[in-house]
């Protein structure tokens, strides 16, 4: 799988295919998927992490089931913009996944995505236990929605129609 910038993905992405969002944690992988028009991100069940081979197989099954054309993977950049061990682990995961699939990936700054997701779940009056179960996929949705919004902006710029919704 190639690692692309969001601009490169916008040029290569075929129309009417879904994009998946991933929030890689140490215990789970939060998942979300776009609609075919790539306007909305919807959370999906998490993958409980076991070891890389099993995690990769589950992720590829998800991608096939959802007909995913690309992955947007949250990159856990520190608040000051520096990259720590979690960024290195995410990059290593993406590189290793690249040996197993041709589906391209974009690394997307995920700063505050989990905080935003938790606030939304609290506002929705989701219990603490259910929040713990849903937070990673909700964060994956925030990550993916940011990328979808950027893809839409790039598409409007490419078409010259800056006033389109």
Curated annotation (Swiss-Prot):
SMART domains to which the protein is assigned, alphabetical: YqgFc
Record has Electron transport as a keyword: no
E.C. no: 3.1.-.-
Single GO cellular component term: cytosol
Keywords annotated in UniProt: Cytoplasm, Hydrolase, Nuclease, Ribosome biogenesis
Any one GO BP annotation for this protein: rRNA 5'-end processing
Recorded family membership: Belongs to the YqgF nuclease family.
This protein's name: Putative pre-16S rRNA nuclease
Native species: Sinorhizobium medicae (strain WSM419)
